[in-house]
Amino acid sequence: MLNADLKQQLKQLLELMEGNVEFVASLGSDDKSKELKELLTEISDMSPRLSLSEKSLKRTPSFSVNRPGEETGVTFAGIPLGHEFNSLVLAILQVSGRAPKEKQSIIDQIKNLEGSFHFETFISLTCQKCPDVVQALNLMSVINPNITHSMIDGAVFREESENIMAVPAVFLNGEEFGNGRMTIQDILSKLGSTADASEFENKEPYDVLIVGGGPASGSAAIYTARKGLRTGIVADRIGGQVNDTAGIENFITVKETTGSEFSSNLAAHIDQYDIDAMTGIRATDIEKTDEAIKVTLENGAVLESKTVIIATGAGWRKLNIPGEEQLINKGVAFCPHCDGPLFENKDVAVIGGGNSGVEAAIDLAGIVNHVTLFEFASELKADNVLQDRLRSLSNVDIKTNAKTTEVVGENHVTGIRYEDMSTGEEHLLNLDGIFVQIGLLPNTSWLKDAVELNERGEIVIDRNNNTNVPGIFAAGDVTDQKNKQIIISMGAGANAALNAFDYIIRN
């Protein structure tokens, strides 16, 4: 089931195992069970430290990743290929005794959790957000014997996942726990365990402190570190919104990559320099005093720096119409690559006629029964090549001059109301899912009145990435820079870094 290149890479990784690992599989006579047995046999034959046995488990087909004679609580229900293959490889290494790369403070938080925690995560193999959650919960299961975790492929267990309309969907002890991408710190926080502010008490002031973790942040950090400046990053996750991007084909010199691969490479590049990257935590306030610029974190800790570069990026913009908020993850979705497979053979709408919306409609047309694309303007704004491709599809309708007015449904989406602005007529379209692709909203709510914002909530900057507050710079999608592209954000981050360096020299 694995191609030659992947087998070679896997064989090298399996050499890092520090102890024996046993696959315990629950198999039936169905085709998926046969595929799973073939995969596990193929992997087991690649290392003398791996073995395979069979036992009836809660779900079939499924398998646990155990130590000989010891259950770890790590289970995969389905066949973990696609984006989840890395989750399987990591689970093998961690169960074998390979030390995780998490900070000791995080490991201690996991060990100190009290109670029994039985997690189940519904995923799709095309979901780019899912592996982060699966890998975090698997690691927690390996570290704490009171935690178990099962990854469940919704495409294999359709009856069980029938009402799951967004992935990853995490359940704890049978109750809904969370949806969407979560870091290990996010999960711990939801369980009531937060990073101690004392961890930050002894940090010396920075020359440059960068808030945010996307392309602009990474670029700025590398540039300032190369100038010999003491550099820190405060970020929820390295890569930012790029983590949720499926394919990247316009990053010059790299013909094709994925958002997750790009983010992984960015993190590795940051690690090559003396940069204090503090991830899994967010900033909540910023203040300039006579002594320093002070950034307050969500755990109450305060960091000081001579300069700050704000690069907090942007998140999905919502429709802000009745019914939308209540039905997010219940039919209202933002990631077609993640959640599209959950709507197989169903009718969906895509809201937005730009490149993102048209690309989403094209992708979904290959999965769902029918796509209706809504655009507020009189014509689509996407590139012509994308529009031509969209119009060639037989199961897509395009509605322009269409103002969406209400998401309809109680426990899940059943339809959408819209106004035909050319006639003033109201219409109801019955459907099962709505994918919102109307642009991004800058992550600036935490700034309050600290720096000048425009009417769209973007930070106002000049050509040198200065804000209206000396010493505070901004870069990337959080700013009023017109074009929002990865490569432009990276250039902006470098520009902000060089001007922060110049500011420090002159002040």
Swiss-Prot record:
GO terms for biological process: response to reactive oxygen species. It holds the Pfam family Pyr_redox_2. NAD(+) binds at residues 347-361. Disulfide bonds join 335-338. Keywords: Disulfide bond, FAD, Flavoprotein, NAD, NADP, Oxidoreductase, Redox-active center. FAD binds at residues 207-222, 467-477. PROSITE patterns: GLUTAREDOXIN_2, PYRIDINE_REDOX_2. Its cofactor is FAD. Binds 1 FAD per subunit. Its EC number is 1.8.1.-. It is an enzyme of class 1 (oxidoreductase). One of its GO terms (molecular function) is NAD binding. It comes from the Bacteria. The active site is a redox-active disulfide bond. Belongs to the class-II pyridine nucleotide-disulfide oxidoreductase family. Serves to protect the cell against DNA damage by alkyl hydroperoxides. It can use either NADH or NADPH as electron donor for direct reduction of redox dyes or of alkyl hydroperoxides when combined with the AhpC protein. Homodimer. This is Alkyl hydroperoxide reductase subunit F. The lineage of its organism: Bacteria, Bacillati, Bacillota, Bacilli, Bacillales.
